Protein backbone atom coordinates (compact mmCIF):
# COMPACT_ATOMS: atom_id res chain seq x y z
CA UNK A 1 0.00 0.00 0.00
CA UNK A 2 1.27 3.44 -0.91
CA UNK A 3 1.49 6.19 1.69
CA UNK A 4 -0.02 8.95 -0.44
CA UNK A 5 0.97 11.73 1.97
CA UNK A 6 4.61 10.74 2.50
CA UNK A 7 5.37 9.54 -1.04
CA UNK A 8 8.24 11.39 -2.74
CA UNK A 9 10.50 10.48 -5.65
CA UNK A 10 13.39 12.60 -6.87
CA UNK A 11 14.59 12.47 -10.47
CA UNK A 12 17.05 14.36 -12.66
CA UNK A 13 15.96 15.60 -16.08
CA UNK A 14 18.12 15.55 -19.20
CA UNK A 15 19.05 19.20 -18.60
CA UNK A 16 20.30 18.41 -15.08
CA UNK A 17 17.36 20.00 -13.24
CA UNK A 18 16.08 18.13 -10.19
CA UNK A 19 12.40 17.34 -9.98
CA UNK A 20 10.31 15.81 -7.22
CA UNK A 21 7.28 13.61 -7.85
CA UNK A 22 4.52 13.67 -5.25
CA UNK A 23 0.78 13.37 -5.13
CA UNK A 24 -1.61 16.29 -5.39
CA UNK A 25 -2.81 17.68 -2.07
CA UNK A 26 -5.09 20.53 -1.00
CA UNK A 27 -2.16 22.96 -0.81
CA UNK A 28 -1.58 22.70 -4.58
CA UNK A 29 -4.70 24.55 -5.72
CA UNK A 30 -3.10 27.81 -6.91
CA UNK A 31 -0.09 26.11 -8.51
CA UNK A 32 -2.24 23.61 -10.40
CA UNK A 33 -4.50 26.40 -11.65
CA UNK A 34 -1.37 28.33 -12.73
CA UNK A 35 0.03 25.30 -14.59
CA UNK A 36 -3.02 25.17 -16.83
CA UNK A 37 -3.77 28.91 -17.03
CA UNK A 38 -0.22 29.59 -18.23
CA UNK A 39 -0.38 26.91 -20.91
CA UNK A 40 -1.08 28.10 -24.46
CA UNK A 41 -4.41 26.96 -25.92
CA UNK A 42 -2.49 24.96 -28.53
CA UNK A 43 -1.08 22.76 -25.74
CA UNK A 44 -4.49 22.07 -24.22
CA UNK A 45 -6.58 21.32 -27.29
CA UNK A 46 -5.96 17.58 -27.06
CA UNK A 47 -6.88 17.18 -23.39
CA UNK A 48 -10.13 15.43 -22.47
CA UNK A 49 -11.29 18.21 -20.16
CA UNK A 50 -11.23 22.01 -20.22
CA UNK A 51 -8.41 22.55 -17.73
CA UNK A 52 -8.70 26.34 -18.14
CA UNK A 53 -11.97 26.02 -16.21
CA UNK A 54 -10.93 27.04 -12.70
CA UNK A 55 -14.06 25.43 -11.21
CA UNK A 56 -13.02 22.09 -12.71
CA UNK A 57 -9.48 22.31 -11.33
CA UNK A 58 -10.86 23.40 -7.94
CA UNK A 59 -13.14 20.34 -7.95
CA UNK A 60 -10.11 18.07 -8.44
CA UNK A 61 -8.41 19.59 -5.40
CA UNK A 62 -11.61 19.64 -3.34
CA UNK A 63 -12.46 16.03 -4.12
CA UNK A 64 -9.13 14.21 -3.99
CA UNK A 65 -9.80 10.48 -3.88
CA UNK A 66 -6.61 8.48 -4.44
CA UNK A 67 -8.63 5.28 -4.88
CA UNK A 68 -10.41 6.80 -7.90
CA UNK A 69 -7.73 9.01 -9.50
CA UNK A 70 -4.06 9.01 -8.55
CA UNK A 71 -2.77 12.54 -9.40
CA UNK A 72 1.03 12.66 -9.59
CA UNK A 73 2.73 16.05 -9.81
CA UNK A 74 6.23 16.93 -10.99
CA UNK A 75 7.70 19.80 -8.96
CA UNK A 76 10.65 21.80 -10.26
CA UNK A 77 12.78 22.00 -7.10
CA UNK A 78 14.64 25.10 -8.29
CA UNK A 79 11.49 27.23 -8.63
CA UNK A 80 9.19 25.12 -6.41
CA UNK A 81 6.46 25.04 -9.04
CA UNK A 82 4.38 22.36 -10.74
CA UNK A 83 5.73 21.55 -14.20
CA UNK A 84 3.73 18.43 -15.06
CA UNK A 85 0.69 16.45 -14.02
CA UNK A 86 0.10 12.74 -14.59
CA UNK A 87 -3.06 10.96 -13.55
CA UNK A 88 -3.96 7.32 -13.19
CA UNK A 89 -7.74 6.94 -13.55
CA UNK A 90 -8.97 3.66 -12.13
CA UNK A 91 -11.74 1.73 -13.79
CA UNK A 92 -14.89 0.77 -11.93
CA UNK A 93 -16.73 -2.51 -11.52
CA UNK A 94 -15.72 -4.92 -14.30
CA UNK A 95 -12.86 -2.57 -15.26
CA UNK A 96 -11.51 -2.11 -11.72
CA UNK A 97 -8.25 -3.82 -12.72
CA UNK A 98 -7.56 -1.23 -15.47
CA UNK A 99 -5.99 2.20 -15.10
CA UNK A 100 -5.98 4.95 -17.71
CA UNK A 101 -2.85 7.11 -17.88
CA UNK A 102 -2.98 10.81 -18.81
CA UNK A 103 0.06 13.10 -18.77
CA UNK A 104 0.45 16.85 -19.28
CA UNK A 105 3.89 18.50 -19.32
CA UNK A 106 4.30 22.28 -19.46
CA UNK A 107 5.99 23.46 -22.62
CA UNK A 108 9.33 24.62 -21.10
CA UNK A 109 9.88 21.11 -19.71
CA UNK A 110 9.02 19.06 -22.79
CA UNK A 111 11.64 16.88 -24.46
CA UNK A 112 13.63 16.68 -21.20
CA UNK A 113 12.33 13.28 -20.15
CA UNK A 114 9.84 14.36 -17.48
CA UNK A 115 6.88 12.81 -19.30
CA UNK A 116 8.73 9.52 -19.79
CA UNK A 117 9.85 9.46 -16.15
CA UNK A 118 6.28 10.12 -15.01
CA UNK A 119 5.02 7.34 -17.26
CA UNK A 120 7.55 4.93 -15.74
CA UNK A 121 6.41 5.97 -12.28
CA UNK A 122 2.75 5.47 -13.26
CA UNK A 123 3.65 1.90 -14.28
CA UNK A 124 5.38 1.32 -10.92
CA UNK A 125 2.44 2.79 -9.01
CA UNK A 126 -0.03 0.65 -10.98
CA UNK A 127 1.93 -2.45 -9.90
CA UNK A 128 1.83 -1.35 -6.26
CA UNK A 129 -1.89 -0.64 -6.53
CA UNK A 130 -2.58 -4.11 -7.92
CA UNK A 131 -3.81 -3.06 -11.35
CA UNK A 132 -3.56 -5.57 -14.19
CA UNK A 133 -3.68 -3.28 -17.23
CA UNK A 134 -2.80 0.27 -18.18
CA UNK A 135 -4.34 2.03 -21.13
CA UNK A 136 -3.75 5.31 -22.90
CA UNK A 137 -5.57 7.09 -25.68
CA UNK A 138 -3.02 9.00 -27.75
CA UNK A 139 -3.57 11.31 -30.71
CA UNK A 140 -2.21 9.35 -33.69
CA UNK A 141 -0.25 12.37 -34.99
CA UNK A 142 1.75 12.57 -31.74
CA UNK A 143 4.43 10.16 -32.93
CA UNK A 144 6.93 10.95 -30.12
CA UNK A 145 4.33 10.23 -27.47
CA UNK A 146 3.31 6.97 -29.15
CA UNK A 147 6.99 5.97 -29.33
CA UNK A 148 7.56 6.81 -25.64
CA UNK A 149 4.62 4.63 -24.60
CA UNK A 150 5.69 1.82 -26.94
CA UNK A 151 9.22 1.93 -25.48
CA UNK A 152 7.70 1.35 -22.04
CA UNK A 153 5.77 -1.74 -23.02
CA UNK A 154 2.52 -0.32 -24.37
CA UNK A 155 1.14 -1.83 -27.57
CA UNK A 156 -1.17 -0.17 -30.08
CA UNK A 157 -4.35 -2.26 -29.97
CA UNK A 158 -6.63 -0.13 -32.14
CA UNK A 159 -6.75 3.04 -34.18
CA UNK A 160 -10.04 4.83 -33.69
CA UNK A 161 -10.67 7.09 -36.67
CA UNK A 162 -12.03 10.57 -35.94
CA UNK A 163 -12.55 9.52 -32.31
CA UNK A 164 -11.34 12.77 -30.73
CA UNK A 165 -12.97 16.09 -31.57
CA UNK A 166 -11.46 19.43 -30.59
CA UNK A 167 -13.44 22.47 -29.53
CA UNK A 168 -13.10 23.85 -33.07
CA UNK A 169 -14.73 20.72 -34.54
CA UNK A 170 -11.58 19.19 -36.06
CA UNK A 171 -11.38 15.43 -35.52
CA UNK A 172 -8.30 13.30 -34.93
CA UNK A 173 -7.56 9.61 -34.89
CA UNK A 174 -6.75 8.04 -31.53
CA UNK A 175 -4.41 5.14 -30.93
CA UNK A 176 -5.61 2.97 -28.07
CA UNK A 177 -2.51 1.61 -26.34
CA UNK A 178 -2.49 -1.09 -23.66
CA UNK A 179 0.19 -2.48 -21.38
CA UNK A 180 -0.09 -5.42 -19.02
CA UNK A 181 1.01 -4.49 -15.51
CA UNK A 182 1.26 -8.10 -14.37
CA UNK A 183 1.67 -11.23 -16.40
CA UNK A 184 -1.54 -13.16 -16.85
CA UNK A 185 -0.29 -16.08 -14.73
CA UNK A 186 0.56 -13.65 -11.88
CA UNK A 187 -2.90 -12.07 -11.83
CA UNK A 188 -5.09 -13.02 -8.89
CA UNK A 189 -8.76 -12.39 -8.29
Where are these regions (language model features)?
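Glycine-rich phosphate/pyrophosphate-binding loop shared by adenosine-nucleotide-utilizing enzymes
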Residues: 17-19, 79-85, 172
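C-terminal "cap" of GNAT-fold acetyltransferases
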Residues: 162-189
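Helix-loop element at the rim of GNAT/NAT acetyltransferase active sites that forms part
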Residues: 29, 34-48
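Conserved acetyl-CoA-binding loop-helix of GNAT-fold acetyltransferases
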Residues: 105, 111-128, 147-151
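Conserved catalytic-core motifs of GNAT/GCN5-like acyltransferases
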Residues: 137-138, 150-172
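A short beta-loop-alpha structural element at the N-terminal edge
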Residues: 19-32, 180
